[in-house]
């Protein structure tokens, strides 16, 4: 199974006994004919479900979006969201491996017990581009005589209709008659081109080169930089001064150079990246081993190092600092399950989310991440327009250290790197609670091809404490609970993992919780010179 869907490696003697008792000794039948059995792990992994073996209860727990399933090997009944469901064929074991009938997914997950997802009858005008529309938009611009073969794509997104028409659709159901269009930003070497295409008529509406601007740092730039560093004899020479003889153990991080009006000796018209490096010592955490006071300026067009900036040699810290837990004893924890036995209190219709009095549209942008749009709140029968569109506007991380390897560090994480592109798939039960619904999202990559990000966004309802309580002497207690709906997204930019929560409250307010986890940026220093 995948990283978030795995069977426990530990099997108790009782578990083995159950497996042997339920062993597949003879054909299994459904509706009078032999059932076609398939491996549980591969089948449910492909379906996107999370599977765990519960040693204590001697059963499998299966979680997929709004459904929480418990099933024992050999049992004719499964428990789906707290309700019994008769199985046509039980789960069977053969050679310690679980098998399910090919009808299992349809029987269990299409049983009508989960109504979280609804069919969208009228597409919302702000629905993100589909994979087919992304392919279509790219094909249109590639057919242009102005398109060059090595051009890359920094953004392909919906060209949004007029705001007034979108609101009219949301509030009154009036169809938006404007054709679907796409905005495209391309990078031809160091030259930026902005374009707009009509997806219905398959024609280009705009093609405009943008002057005095730099493009985003793309994922293939990381590979280009690493290759340049590995093959550079000049860089290998400066590594030797620091006792490093194998350049392939050096991990590079390409950073934007900033603007210093020529005082750093760099030309703003060149497409440059400053590269700082770390040493891979085998502990899985190269961030703990910075190669300090060494910066390579790489020209992406020329594909070579333009110059190397050096300061005093600082010894590379070599003490292993793993972060994956290999040096710690894991705390044994009993399972903590959050179930909704009667189903979700929210529904997802296409890209629209409805919870209590809230309705909003949700999509993922390759630059800013989640976009919450056309937010309304039903205030005693009146649908109030709360927010047209909300998203991360931008983010800057200035370090403020004057040293040679730090003074230029002021990352524009969203604008320079694309935080939506760097979305980190969420792990159920760790990054989000077990009752979360996971949403896959599709955005374009730098080649213009659709790229699906699994488990990109999570939605879940949670208990948020008591809303009100009063215990009058001699009278019954009066208490009410508070509920919240959370939309969670995580973006990993280098060593930092940024967590963003949009929190919808029952009282008509919206909160935004933002935080960072991951690994702190560290600086190597000579301890002899540190007080």
What function would you assign to each model-found segment?
Residues 163, 215-531:
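Beta-strand/loop-rich accessory regions of lumenal/periplasmic or secreted enzymes
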Residues 63-66, 120-245:
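Post-signal-peptide, soluble extracytosolic/periplasmic N-terminal scaffold domains
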Residues 2-122:
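Primary recognition of N-terminal secretory signal peptides and signal-anchoring hydrophobic helices
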Residues 59-62, 75-81, 184, 353, ...:
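Short polybasic amphipathic segments
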Residues 50-56, 69-77, 112-119, 148-149, ...:
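Extended intrinsically disordered, low-complexity coil regions enriched in Ser, Thr, Gly, Ala
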Residues 72-78, 88-94, 198-203, 229, ...:
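A short, sequence-level motif marking secondary-structure junctions
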Residues 33-38, 93-99, 173-179, 188, ...:
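Short, low-complexity cationic-aromatic patches
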Residues 41-45, 103, 107, 135, ...:
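Solvent-exposed, polar/charged alpha-helical surfaces in well-ordered, non-transmembrane soluble domains
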